[in-house]
UniProtKB/Swiss-Prot annotation:
<keyword id="KW-0479">Metal-binding</keyword>
<feature type="modified residue" description="Phosphoserine">
    <location>
        <position position="400"/>
    </location>
</feature>
<keyword id="KW-0007">Acetylation</keyword>
<dbReference type="InterPro" id="IPR001965">
    <property type="entry name" value="Znf_PHD"/>
</dbReference>
<feature type="compositionally biased region" description="Pro residues">
    <location>
        <begin position="232"/>
        <end position="241"/>
    </location>
</feature>
<feature type="modified residue" description="Phosphoserine">
    <location>
        <position position="124"/>
    </location>
</feature>
<protein>
    <recommendedName>
        <fullName>PHD finger protein 23</fullName>
    </recommendedName>
</protein>
<comment type="subunit">
    <text>Interacts with LRSAM1.</text>
</comment>
<feature type="modified residue" description="Phosphoserine">
    <location>
        <position position="317"/>
    </location>
</feature>
<dbReference type="GO" id="GO:1902902">
    <property type="term" value="P:negative regulation of autophagosome assembly"/>
</dbReference>
<comment type="function">
    <text>Acts as a negative regulator of autophagy, through promoting ubiquitination and degradation of LRSAM1, an E3 ubiquitin ligase that promotes autophagy in response to starvation or infecting bacteria.</text>
</comment>
<feature type="compositionally biased region" description="Pro residues">
    <location>
        <begin position="273"/>
        <end position="287"/>
    </location>
</feature>
<dbReference type="GO" id="GO:1901097">
    <property type="term" value="P:negative regulation of autophagosome maturation"/>
</dbReference>
<dbReference type="GO" id="GO:0031398">
    <property type="term" value="P:positive regulation of protein ubiquitination"/>
</dbReference>
<feature type="region of interest" description="Disordered">
    <location>
        <begin position="1"/>
        <end position="30"/>
    </location>
</feature>
<dbReference type="InterPro" id="IPR011011">
    <property type="entry name" value="Znf_FYVE_PHD"/>
</dbReference>
<keyword id="KW-0862">Zinc</keyword>
């Protein structure tokens, strides 16, 4: 190996002349050729006007002496045949790519002409030419591998304008405005919700509210979720499934709606006057019940409580109240907590109450002077004792705990 490197080849100049003559000659030729090549490329790309020396450039390369050096030492611009081959391949590739672009242009399905002309501006045309030239440089020495910037790939990559069809909006983009409308319609009332194509439970009217049994907040929420699952989707584009943040917002809105409903039930049912009912036969033993009716005059309290007690049999199975041994555990509904039925004019507030056997009014055990451990079978409120003296006869002598 070392001997082969030490032996001078017959084609090499003498070792004394090599360091003196070769480096300046090599540097001069490289700079000239590179400058000419750059001017040719710039002229071809249209940046500078074409010079008359272009035709003489291949001949100038032939004046340089041929050197039979190894491929590692030789540059791309050393010999005249390589220069000529380079120029010819440039010209051929440019012409063929132009021809291909001209053929593929009218046949390929593209967008309307206005968008196509906008996409193919003069700047983009010159950019395409430069990219083709770069690709031809890469393909000179090695095998022709389709590079990402090859003319064929350029013709294919110039097709995406044809695929610029209007894409429909995603479901996430469309989900927010209909949901906002749905919330607004829910807040406006049953009429607006029905107009939007949503099945909705109507709000309780003053007469309705007395008859229907009270439902706990947790059960209301479950019912609302079930109804929301059974609702028809609103007309229009499909909605995306609500995200976690949306469900939290909806729960907050549901709580606000329930508070509004409580206000309407408590405030809206009060001014309804109801005639007093005729005296009834004594009832079965009264049980402690946490529920009542909205505040009104004494007669409306009595009638509302009787209706509530009639409908209360169905609601008691749902766990409206629980009596465990002698200790009374009270679970309140959402709108019965603030109801005022006792003559102390204080709300229910979760305290144990007893029902009058005649008028059905609910009275606090503490106001009736009754202990939790000694609840009587028949109880008559103070008003029934004053208005109906037969109450004493029906129930026997008054209980010691009664006022």
């Amino acid at each position: 190996m070392l001997e082969a490197m030490a032996e001078p080849s017959p084609e090499d100049p003498p070792p004394t002349l090599k360091p003196e003559t070769q480096p300046p000659e090599k540097r001069r030729r490289t700079i000239e050729d590179f400058n000419k090549f750059c001017s040719f490329v710039l002229a071809y790309a249209g940046y500078i006007p074409p010079s008359k020396e272009e035709s003489d450039w291949p001949a100038s390369g032939s004046s340089s002496p041929l050197r039979g050096e190894s491929a590692a030492d030789s540059d791309g611009w050393d010999s005249a045949p390589s220069d000529l081959r380079t120029i010819q391949t440039f010209v051929k590739k440019a012409k063929s790519s132009k021809r291909r672009a001209a053929q593929a242009g009218p046949t390929q399905p593209g967008p309307p002409r206005s968008t196509f002309s906008r996409l193919q501006a003069p700047d983009s045309a010159t950019l395409l030419e430069k990219m083709k030239l770069k690709d031809s440089l890469f393909d000179l020495d090695g095998p022709k591998v389709a590079s990402p910037l090859s003319p064929t790939s350029l013709t294919h990559t110039s097709r995406p304008p044809a695929a610029l069809t209007p894409v429909p909006l995603s479901q996430g983009d469309l989900s927010h405005p209909p949901r906002k409308k749905d919330r607004k319609n829910r807040k406006l009332g049953p009429g607006a919700g029905a107009g939007f194509g949503v099945l909705r439970r109507p709000r309780p009217t003053p007469g309705d509210g007395e008859k229907r049994s009270r439902i706990k907040k947790s059960k209301k929420r479950k019912l609302k979720k079930a109804e929301r699952g059974d609702r028809l989707p609103p007309p229009g584009p499909p909605q995306a499934p609500p995200s976690d943040t949306d469900s939290e917002e909806e729960e907050e809105e549901e709580e606000e709606e329930e508070e509004e409903e409580m206000a309407t039930v408590v405030g809206g049912e009060a001014p309804v006057p109801v005639l007093p009912t005729p005296p009834e036969a004594p009832r079965p033993p009264a049980t402690v019940h946490p529920e009542g009716v909205p505040p009104a005059d004494s007669e409306s309290k009595e009638v509302g409580s009787t209706e509530t007690s009639q409908d209360g049999d169905a609601s008691s199975s749902e766990g409206e109240m629980r009596v465990m041994d002698e200790d009374i555990m009270v679970e309140s509904g959402d709108d019965s907590w603030d109801l005022i039925t006792c003559y102390c004019r204080k709300p229910f507030a979760g305290r144990p109450m007893i029902e009058c056997s005649l008028c059905g009014t609910w009275i606090h055990l503490s106001c009736a002077k009754i202990k939790k451990t000694n609840v009587p079978d028949f109880f008559y409120c103070q008003k029934c004792k004053e208005l109906r003296p037969e109450a004493r006869r029906l129930g026997g002598p008054p209980k010691s705990g009664e006022p």
